[in-house]
Amino acid sequence: MFTTAIAGSLPKPAWLAETEKLWPQWTTQGPELQQAKADATLLWIKAQEDAGLDVIGDGEQARQHFVHGFVEQVEGIDFVNKVTMGIRNNRYDAQVPQVIAPLRLKGRVHAFEAQLARAHTKKKLKFTLPGPMTIVDTVADRFYGDKVKMAMAFAELLNQEALALQADGVDIIQFDEPAFNVYMDEAADWGVKALEVAARGLTCITAVHICYGYGIEANNKWKETLGHEWRQYEKVFPALAKSSIQQVSLECMHSHVPMEMMKLLEGCLLYTSPSPRDCS
């Protein structure tokens, strides 16, 4: 039998953050914000347990954005002077921070929510992190001058946090990589390698979630161009099957990925998410 779990993020209540916005703002600040994040996390843990899920997540209630929630705790990134950049192969424009110096973690990134979740559930705990390829597609490079080099730098930082999360008692660490459904050649060439750097040394279960993005017009129009069969994974799946990543989560409800392509993932335990994930 397959264990049951959410893909990752869950809606934030209106008393925590703005609703139905791509880049929502927090509705409070300071100690009140920290308490609101904790309250929302605990409410969703209870909801998941009440639903009978086998694996529990924090619902990403303490993060404004699935990428920025990590990179905000990285030195060498300028969030003040954001620039407009096309992301996901120029599918749409976004205001993104700039990498301007060597990348280093300021300290722990997700200790608060991981330890909170671990203390409030006896079930298996999953925690999500953005994948290195998706991070470099969501920030502007003004320092490294090489996308792969910057991805590997982020992968090292992700690895530091992933090992710390494992020490916090996390059972499954999932890396979110929507870039894997956009840059097929690059994902097979170096994206999976960067992912393995991020997962290096982990003894807990490792997973990658390949999501199709927010339900915004730009994403919906892009999906319409993919035809009646989405075979773009023929390049990426074999690379993932050969990797050390143990699980693949793929959003299938609104996709047209032929089921026979799952054979290309032999060696991985495949999960198919029932609905689009809240990531771009």
Q: Where are the regions a protein language model picked out?
A:
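Active-site loop segments of alpha/beta catalytic cores
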Residues: 112-115, 119-129, 134-270
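N-terminal basic, low-complexity leaders that serve as flexible interaction/assembly modules and, when applicable
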Residues: 1-76, 112-127, 147-153, 192-203
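A gly/proline- and charged-residue-enriched helix-loop-helix capping module
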Residues: 88-107
